């Protein structure tokens, strides 16, 4: 039978104890989505689904007001600022807006304003498009920009001043007359749709992460640690509000006059903003801008209505997390029905197999949609990331009629299946167990939803990332052959697998590397010398360089020490791979691998899967044919004062490098860890040791100076 999602309890029938449980569930879920949206710039659900969660939370809190507490999302704004940027306290909180989803809710908002102000007539209202971007506060002192901050949790944001100075729409100096001594001016950072598409194309071509929508790209670009990255992104800014103002630049200030002043001061103000004098005017603007929505060069997700007179705004004040004098009239999520013709599998650069729905073209929100992501096998089967049913547990099949929604108005997703129209012969989709690009086995590890290609060394879809890993510092570490060179050589077809690196010199009569821009005879000669120097390599570096899933530097060293030599390692791996079956592996070789301290089932299975793929073996054999010697692993001693001890190095070491210290400790039988815990035996502290030293003292861990460490290990 098909699993059914347990329906949310009806609010009308909720008892107080059940309401308390439901509120806790909703609060935790909303807080998680707030973090994904405000901190990670990666929302996990559509705006419509998020709004539905909030409306349910608000409805329950209205029924049980005694259950409202200060930590509820209805009493807070956004999410706490991330740790990567300095914190900034907003002089005036940056609150969020209440939402309206229907015309009568807008009318109710205006009536509430009239009642509160005791007005006979509808006050003038400013209507403006609600830009789907990232809120920003700009502080000016004597007309000069001194600080820029994100909204954060509404009270404390992140200092992004250096990045904001690269946005052309943000003036460093305010123009015109009547400039306040101090003012906080606010607006939205966004990205034009065409700029977003161009950026994603560049990201994809460079093998970098692509953004889900313009809002995410704007937020991610603004919150870059490298200001040059932000400067390279086409960010825009609309000004529409303010916080602290030492003085207003005009008598009897109003919202629309302040927007005019912002325009004169050097900001870009949205030209669509309109002054309305009735509810009918406001709703007419909403419908008009909704019709223009698809043709606008930027994304909007609704309309914001604000009482025009600032003295009225001041009298109206605020309720918990939002002002009484403004409301957001949200657009409904745009959906359409179409037929899913085919499910294709794409292979990512890390080997992940991702299903994509090929749809009969359909217009959703003014955009023609032909593809939609299906995420993974579980999503197709109707199972969410938490293991619970989604879409009422209904699976997705080729030939299905489906409802498509543009999440965040950009990413198409399938939200439901029209079961009444499912073809009689539609079969459940069977996820492929082979990579569609290279034909290698695909595996799905326990606890994961993703299938991955095991053709690590030979799959074209993974080639560039695997080659970058192969030449990385902890692997072959070839001087002069970094990521950019790998990308160039792979793009030209010169290096497709690791062995090709070692044949560059022999092929250079045809390749002519010295004719490349930035190269010359000397640099090419140095590159070939560096490559030749790596024809002799340590066993643990070779194992790490293969890019086997879950085999990092530490596990590579464990494997190298256990088997000792390349021949012993390869012999054991081939024996284990030959014995691999769908039911498992009971061979002596596999059991020996699985029993290595620190390895375990997950790593052992990943290693065997790698060696079970014959084309990986061929690529490895081709590489080994180019190498001169693979050095046996240096066996750790067991007769030293630190054998079996866990050691952490922290601070600036003066007598040896961190890598030298680590290698020496491991040779003496110690385990070197990256963090301090109760299991740590020694912390070796150099100059400017920080939090690790503090934690060691708190836990009572023995702390040694460099000299004391050298004395302990016998210098």
UniProtKB/Swiss-Prot annotation:
SMART domains: BRCT, LIGANc. Keywords: DNA damage, DNA repair, DNA replication, Ligase, Magnesium, Manganese, Metal-binding, NAD, Zinc. One of its GO terms (cellular component) is cytosol. Zn(2+) binds at residues 435, 438, 453, 459. It catalyses: NAD(+) + (deoxyribonucleotide)n-3'-hydroxyl + 5'-phospho-(deoxyribonucleotide)m = (deoxyribonucleotide)n+m + AMP + beta-nicotinamide D-nucleotide. PANTHER family: CHROMOSOME TRANSMISSION FIDELITY FACTOR 18, DNA LIGASE. This is DNA ligase. The gene is ligA.
């Amino acid at each position: 039978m098909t699993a059914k999602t347990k329906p949310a309890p009806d609010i009308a029938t909720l008892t107080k104890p059940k309401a308390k449980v439901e509120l806790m569930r909703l609060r935790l879920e909303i807080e998680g989505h707030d973090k994904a949206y405000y901190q990670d710039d990666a929302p996990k659900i559509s705006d419509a689904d998020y709004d539905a969660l909030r409306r349910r939370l608000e409805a329950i809190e209205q029924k049980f007001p005694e259950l409202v507490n200060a930590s509820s999302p209805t009493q807070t704004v956004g999410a706490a600022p991330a740790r990567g940027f300095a914190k900034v306290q907003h002089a005036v909180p940056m609150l969020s807006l209440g939402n309206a989803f229907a015309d009568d809710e807008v009318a109710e908002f205006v009536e509430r304003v009239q009642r509160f102000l005791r007005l006979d007539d509808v006050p003038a209202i400013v209507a403006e498009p609600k830009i789907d971007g990232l809120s920003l506060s700009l502080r000016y002192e004597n007309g000069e920009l001194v600080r820029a901050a994100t909204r954060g949790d509404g009270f404390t944001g992140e200092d992004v001043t250096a990045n904001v100075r690269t946005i052309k729409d943000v003036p460093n100096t305010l123009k015109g007359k009547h400039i306040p001594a101090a003012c906080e001016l606010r607006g939205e950072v966004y990205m034009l749709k065409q700029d977003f598409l161009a950026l994603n194309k560049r990201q994809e071509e460079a093998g970098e992460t692509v953004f889900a929508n313009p809002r995410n790209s704007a937020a991610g670009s603004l919150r870059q640690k490298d200001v040059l990255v932000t400067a390279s992104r086409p960010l825009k800014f609309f000004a529409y509000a303010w916080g602290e103002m030492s003085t207003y630049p005009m008598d009897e200030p109003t919202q629309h006059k302040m927007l005019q002043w912002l325009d004169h001061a050097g900001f870009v103000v949205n030209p669509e903003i309109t002054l309305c004098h009735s509810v009918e005017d406001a709703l007419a603007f909403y419908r008009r801008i909704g019709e223009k929505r698809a043709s606008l060069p930027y994304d909007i997700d609704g309309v914001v209505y604000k009482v025009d007179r600032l003295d009225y705004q001041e009298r109206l004040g605020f309720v918990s997390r939002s002002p009484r004098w403004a409301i957001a009239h949200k657009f409904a999520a745009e959906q359409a029905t179409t037929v899913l013709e085919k499910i294709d599998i794409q292979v990512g650069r890390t080997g992940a197999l991702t299903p994509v729905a090929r749809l009969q073209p359909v217009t959703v929100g003014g955009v023609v949609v032909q593809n939609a992501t299906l995420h993974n096998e579980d999503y197709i089967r109707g199972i969410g990331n938490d293991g619970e049913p989604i879409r009422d547990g209904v699976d997705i099949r080729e030939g299905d009629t489906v409802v498509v929604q543009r999440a965040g108005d950009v990413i198409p997703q399938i939200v439901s299946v029209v079961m009444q129209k499912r073809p009689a012969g539609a079969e459940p989709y069977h996820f492929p167990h082979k990579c569609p690009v290279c034909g290698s086995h695909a595996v799905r590890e326990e606890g994961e939803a993703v299938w991955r290609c095991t053709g690590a060394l030979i799959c074209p879809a993974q080639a560039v990332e695997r080659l970058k890993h192969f030449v990385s510092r902890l692997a072959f570490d070839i001087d002069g052959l970094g990521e950019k060179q790998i990308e160039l050589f792979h793009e030209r077809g010169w290096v497709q697998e690791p062995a090709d690196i070692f044949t560059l010199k022999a092929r250079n009569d045809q390749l002519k590397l010295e004719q490349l821009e930035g190269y010359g005879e000397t640099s090419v000669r140095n590159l070939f010398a560096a490559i030749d120097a790596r024809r002799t390599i340590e066993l643990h570096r070779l194992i790490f360089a293969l890019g086997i899933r879950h085999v990092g530097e530490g596990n590579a060293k464990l494997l190298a020490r256990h088997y000792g030599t390349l021949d012993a390692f390869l012999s054991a791996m081939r024996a284990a791979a030959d014995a691999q079956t769908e039911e498992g592996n009971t061979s002596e070789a596999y059991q020996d691998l699985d029993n290595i301290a620190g390895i375990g089932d997950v790593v052992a299975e990943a290693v065997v899967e790698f060696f079970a793929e014959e084309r990986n073996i061929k690529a490895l054999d081709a590489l080994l044919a180019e190498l001169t010697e693979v050095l046996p692993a240096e066996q750790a001693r067991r007769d030293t004062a630190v054998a079996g001890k866990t050691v952490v190095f922290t601070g600036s070491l003066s007598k040896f490098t961190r890598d030298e210290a680590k290698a020496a400790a491991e040779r003496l039988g110690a385990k070197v860890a990256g963090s301090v815990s109760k299991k740590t035996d020694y912390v070796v502290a150099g100059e400017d040791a920080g939090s690790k030293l503090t934690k060691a003292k708190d836990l009572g861990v023995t702390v040694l100076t460099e000299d004391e460490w050298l004395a302990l290990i016998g210098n």
